[in-house]
Amino acid sequence: MGAATNQAPELWGAVAAHVPFVDVLNTMLDETLPLTPIEWPEWGNPLEDKAAFEHIHSYSPYDQLVAGTFPPMIITAGLNDPRVTYWEPAKYVARLRHLAECSNNIILKTNMEAGHGGSSGRYNAQYELAEEYAFILDHLQTGPERQS
């Protein structure tokens, strides 16, 4: 959702992004992360290949953010996520807020116990999904009764 939102923010009434891979370049530059070296054959190694660096930079959502009006967004992170580290969504949200030329909600929700798949437990995942649905429905609601 990061790249799609960056390219055409006006198309989205609200966005929910689950543990989004939005800081692609910095992740692919960090060989200490468990998945980075095994991803190089597919993505290219930006540490050794300037063309790979430039290509990844050209589409990395974090690197392609520019000032503008963004839709309301709820973005999640899992503190124990080994695939998309929690700081990726956090950096992205911080930059979105800094560049936003609007007052739309841009929310970061970090689950302090979750990994990449979100909450575990009998009802926790449904609770999180209901929260996101409520966020989206609230922001898509229209009519004179809607107050911003």
Predicted segment positions?
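Active-site-proximal cap/loop segments of hydrolase catalytic domains
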Residues: 1-148
